[in-house]
């Protein structure tokens, strides 16, 4: 992790535990919460209606689960990126794979449909650099 970086995370135990293992004391930020899966939260993927899952993956605006759409997540994460780009120094976010996917899509100004084509394993680091209001991807999915 970058030295002397400010750290942010959501308030879940898994991000708190990861931050503690990294020696970080993050500031809670709801913008870094995982994608809200609504009625699908905690359910096994194989138990979900196949047609609804397929529609959800194909359409970033879909919310068959009653939670948050991928477009909603991209907007939320985009707002967070805009805020931290204005801060001096380095920032570390301890967050969830879906949020990291959203960060990459927003930073690269990629098509929202590319969200599901980004694989983010747990306990990895993705690095970006902001300059002049634009983001550049430095590295992705390096093991911690």
Regions found by a protein language model. Give the residues of each.
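A short, N-terminal amphipathic alpha-helix
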Residues: 1-5, 82-83, 130
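Phosphate-coordination/substrate-recognition cap region in phosphate-metabolizing enzymes
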Residues: 1-53
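Generic beta-sheet signal
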Residues: 5, 87-98
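Short beta-strand scaffold positions
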Residues: 9-10, 75, 94-95
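Amphipathic, non-transmembrane alpha-helical scaffold segments
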Residues: 12, 70, 74-78, 117
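Acidic, low-complexity terminal tails and accessory targeting/binding regions
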Residues: 35-46, 105-144
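Short glycine/proline- and acidic residue-enriched helix-loop micro-motifs
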Residues: 52-72
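Generic structural signal for well-ordered alpha-helical scaffold segments
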Residues: 74, 78-85, 104
């Amino acid at each position: 992790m970058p030295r002397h970086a400010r750290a942010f995370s959501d308030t879940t135990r898994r991000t708190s535990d990861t931050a503690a293992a990294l020696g970080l004391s993050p500031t809670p930020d709801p913008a870094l919460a995982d994608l809200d899966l609504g009625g699908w939260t905690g359910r096994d993927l194989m138990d979900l209606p196949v047609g609804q899952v397929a529609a959800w993956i194909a359409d970033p605006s879909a919310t068959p689960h009653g939670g948050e759409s991928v477009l909603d997540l991209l907007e939320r994460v985009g707002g967070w990126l805009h805020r931290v780009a204005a801060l001096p120094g380095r920032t570390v976010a301890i967050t969830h794979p879906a949020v990291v996917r959203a960060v990459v899509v927003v930073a690269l100004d990629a098509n929202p449909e590319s969200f599901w084509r980004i694989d983010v394993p747990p306990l990895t680091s993705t690095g970006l650099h902001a300059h002049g209001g634009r983001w550049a991807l430095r590295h992705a999915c390096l093991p911690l």
